[in-house]
Amino acid sequence: MEEFKGYLQKGGFKQQHFLYPLLFQEYIYVLAHDHGLNVNASTFNEPSEISGYDNKSSLLLVKRLITRIYQQNSLIHSVNDSNQNIFVGHNKNFYYQMISEGFAIVVEIPFSLRLVSSFKEKKEIPKSQNLRSIHSIFPFLEDKFAHLNYVSDILIPYPVHLEILVQILQCWIQDVPSLHLLRFLFHQYHNGNNCITPKKSSYGFSKDNPRLYRFLYNSYVVEYESIFVFLRKSSSYLRSTSFGTLLERTYFYGKMKNIGVTHSNNFQKTLWLFKDPFMHYVRYQGKSIMASKGTHLLMKKWKSYFVNLWQCHFHFWSQPSRIHINQFSHFSFYFLGYLSSVPRNRSSVTTQMLENSFLIETVTKKFETMVSIIPMIGSLSKAKFCNLSGNPISKPVWADLSDLDIIDRFGRICRNLSHYYSGSSKKQSLYRIKYILRLSCARTLARKHKSTVRAFLQRLGSEFLEEFFMEEEKVLSLILPRTSYPLHKLYRAPIWYLDIIRINDLVNNL
C-alpha cells in the first residue's frame, strides 16, 4: 500500500501560505460575509512608480481597493485632474475586477517559484521547448495509436459547483482568508449562479478575468486527471471496495486498511479484468482522448468509472453520451484541428513454392491525419473570407488598407494555416483552403480598386501568388522536384513542426 501513500500524500509545494494574511489582514473575512456593501464611485491616485507599468499588477493597489470598499462612505474624493485620476467613473464592479486580477497574480507566485527552483537544482536546464509544441503530440499518436483497438472520445463535463472549486484549492492553499476572498469573488461575479457554465454569466467572468478563470479551470482539470491517474494505477483494487468511497480522499488511509484485508484474496481474480498496460490518454482544452488495446468491455468499465467520478467527487450529473467508445478501424476523431483515424489497409501477395502458389493477405494499420474541410469552411465563413458554400468573397473591412498590408495579412494567414496543417496525410483540403484565401485576397484588392479579379491578377502577375507560399515550401520545391516520383512522395509526407505553441484562431474556433 506504500505506493498509494505516495500518490495522495500532500507535497510540500502544494501547501502554500500566500501573502493574504499580511496583505489583506481582516478585510477578506469582512468582504466574504458582508454582501451589503454600498460604496460610492470614488477613486484615488496612485503614482505610476507604485502601481506598476499597467496599473493592474500592483498588490498595493489591490489592498487599497479592498480598504476602500471596506471603509464605505468614509472617503470622498473630488476629481480635479482627469489625467491623474485614471479610475474616475468606475463603480464597485471595477474594484472587484482589480481585486480578482491581483488574486490571480498572487496565487500563481508559488507555482512560478517552484518552476524556477526546479531549474536551479539542475546544472543544465533541459531543452523542453520542443515538448511545448502542439505538434509534438502527433508523432506520439502515430507511434502508439496504430497498435490500439478502441478509443474513447471524452468531453470534460461542466458545470462545476463553485464550492467544489474552493474545496479543490484547499489542497493547495492553507490560508482561510484567501478562500474567503475567492468565495466572495464567486458570489459577486455570478450573482447567485454557483456554477461555471458556458452561459452568459460565466462568459462575462472568463472575459473579465481570464487569468483567474484559467487558473480555476486548470485546477479543476488537475484534480480530475490526478484522480484518473490514481484510478489507472490502482485499477486492480477497485473490485474489492466501494468505488464511490474510494474517490473521497479525506479518509483515504483508513479506507485502504479495509482494502488490504480483501486485497490478498481478490488480487489474482481482479487483476486481469482491469489491468491494461496499453492505455494512453491525451488532452487539449476541454476534450480528451483515451485509447486502449483492451476489449470493448474494458472501455465500458472505464466509461462507468468516469461517470461515477464526476457524480461522486464533483457532485454533478454527467451524461454518459459525452463519452463515445468506438473501434479505431471504424471511427475518426476530431482533435486539435485534425480529423484523425487508423484505417486498415489490406494488401495481397502471391507467393509460389515449387508447383504450389499461395495468396497471402496482410493487414496494416497507419495513423492518418486530415484537414476537416467542412468545419474549416465554416470557420472561414465566420471570418468573412468565403460563404457557407466555400466560395471566396471579398473582405470589405480590409479594403481601406494599403495593397501591401492586405496582401501581407492574407499571406500571413495562409502561411500560418499551411504551417499548422503541414502534418496532414492528404493535402487536397489544404490546397482548397489556400485557394479560398488567395481568391478572397484578389477580390478584396479588386473591390478596393473597383476592378475585376481577372484584370487585377493580370496586372500583379506571379508575384502575388508568392506571398502565399511558406518559406519551407519554397525550399522543398527547390530541393525536392515534383517530377521525380520518390521525391514527390516525400514532398507530400506529413511534416510536424516543433515550434507551434498555440492553435491558429481559425482552427481554434472550429
UniProtKB/Swiss-Prot annotation:
Keywords: Chloroplast, mRNA processing, Plastid, RNA-binding, tRNA processing. Its main location: plastid. The keyword Zinc does not apply. GO terms for molecular function: RNA binding. It is found in: Plastid, Chloroplast. GO terms for cellular component: chloroplast. InterPro entries: Domain_X, Maturase_MatK, Maturase_MatK_N. It comes from the Eukaryota. The keyword Glycoprotein does not apply. GO terms for biological process: mRNA processing; RNA splicing; tRNA processing. HAMAP family: MatK. Usually encoded in the trnK tRNA gene intron. Probably assists in splicing its own and other chloroplast group II introns. Belongs to the intron maturase 2 family. MatK subfamily. This is Maturase K.
